[in-house]
Amino acid sequence: MAVNLTRRQALAAGAAGLTAAVAGGAGLVQAGVLPGRYRVGRLLGACDVGDPPPTTVAPGPLRFASFASKARGRPVAYGVAWPPGSGPGDRLPVCLLLHAAAGNERTPFERLRLHHHLAQAAGPGRVRPLALAWADGDGSGWRPAPGDDPFAMLLDELLPLLSGLGLRTSPGQVGVLGWSMGGAGALRLAERSPDRLAAVVATSPAVAASGPEVAGTGRLRALPVKIDCGANDPFADATRALAAALPTAEVAVAKGCHDGVFWQRQAPAQLRFLAAALGP
C-alpha cells in the first residue's frame, strides 16, 4: 500500500536518517572500522583531560650546554634540571629524558615544563629529590645506526658528564622517561641495557603491537616499568600489547590523546614513580 508523506514528515524523516547515519559513521570510526578515529575522537572530547596540573613552586637551577659526541659523530646539546634547593655538586639520582620526534633537548623544559613539575613533586615531605637530564636526539629516532648510536651517547658520554656535576649515575640511580618516539626509545634503551638502569617510564610509546619493543619486554621483567597512554592515541592498542607482554609493569590507558596536555597530566605520578625506584 502506498504511503503519502507530507513535506514536513519527509524532511523530519530525512533529518532523523542523517543523524543516525552520522552517529553510525562516528561509531564505526571510533571502532576503527573507518579511518579518522583520532580526529573524530578529538572532536568528540576524547582529549579533554583538563588543564595540566598546577605548579606553584619555583623551579630549581637549569643548565644547558653541549659536548662533542663520538658515539653520534656530532655535537650534542643537553640540559640538566635540579630541584629547588639543589644544584651542581649535589649527590642526586638522575632521570634521562627522551624527547618526541619533533622535539629537542629543550622540549621537556619549554613545552612540557618538567622542571616545574619536578619542583612541585620534590617539595618538603613529598618525593625523594632527583635531577632530570636530557639530550638532543637530533633525528635519530632513538634508534642506534652505524656511526650514530644515541644510546651509547646517553650511557657512555652523557652520564659521565652528569657524574662530573655531582649526580649519582651508578646503575641503581639512573632512570629513563620518554614520550612518543622517546617513549619507544626508553623501552629500547632499557631492553638493550637493563643492567644500567633502575626504572623506565614510557609515555604514549610509538611502537607497534607486533614490534621488537613488545617482543623484547622479557628483558624488562626485573625493572620497575610504568607505561601511560591515552585511549584516543594511535598507540593505545600497542600499549595494551605491552601490558599483556609485561604483566609486572604498571600500565594505564586512560582518557586522553597523543599530545602535550596528556603528557603533562601524567608527569606528577611518573616523577613519584621514578623517585621511589631510584636509589637514595
Describe the predicted segments one by one.
Residues A2-L5, Q9-P280:
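Non-catalytic cap/lid and distal C-terminal segments of serine-dependent acyl enzymes
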